[in-house]
Amino acid sequence: MYEGAVQELIDELGRLPGVGPKSAQRLAFHILEADPQDMKRLVEAITTVKERVKFCTVCGNVTEQELCNICRDPRRDPSIICVVEESKDVLAVERTRSFRGRYHVLGGAINPIAGVGPEQLRIRELLTRLNDGAIQEIIIATDPNLEGEATATYLARMLKSIGITVTRLASGLPVGGDLEYADEVTLGRAFEGRRNALS
């Protein structure tokens, strides 16, 4: 264990997702040894992203404007909405070039152990989007893990009464995996083979 500022930096870096104690230590020492100008640019980039980036008022994706570039794009099919957990999942789906509709970012998944229920997600906003009658299909593209499956089942049951086609990505994605780590071919095939979410 280190003392003072070094340990504080290691502790803070260790709070980042996917960064364990050893990685936090390596990052901290890289920062200590790096060129001060490089670190200044890093700090400025972090500050800038926290100041400028917000969430799209329609879909919840990250953007620097009121609407994200996908919601602003008139070439996107507004009748199909792909529901994902996080903004990083939008990028994963976009890499496939298989989907030309629009998105809805929930901001997470149902996880009772972590205290995340449907009311903490952007489900009300999704229902509001369905009110105009233009949406014909909802594709549920949550992660194929316990939380993602719980969220998909909840959404499918809730949307069934509305009379909109609700589909779920096909198998091919590893159970327990994260959507953002799927390769383009696997994710593309999952889109092509999507199925009714209640079957």
Curated annotation (Swiss-Prot):
Keywords: DNA damage, DNA recombination, DNA repair, Metal-binding, Zinc, Zinc-finger. GO terms for biological process: DNA recombination; DNA repair. Pfam families: RecR_C, RecR_HhH, RecR_ZnF, Toprim_4. CDD domains: TOPRIM_recR. A zinc finger (C4-type) spans 56-71. The keyword Zinc applies. Residues 79-174 form the Toprim domain. PROSITE patterns: RECR, TOPRIM. GO terms for molecular function: DNA binding; zinc ion binding. It comes from the Bacteria. May play a role in DNA repair. It seems to be involved in an RecBC-independent recombinational process of DNA repair. It may act with RecF and RecO. Belongs to the RecR family. This is Recombination protein RecR.
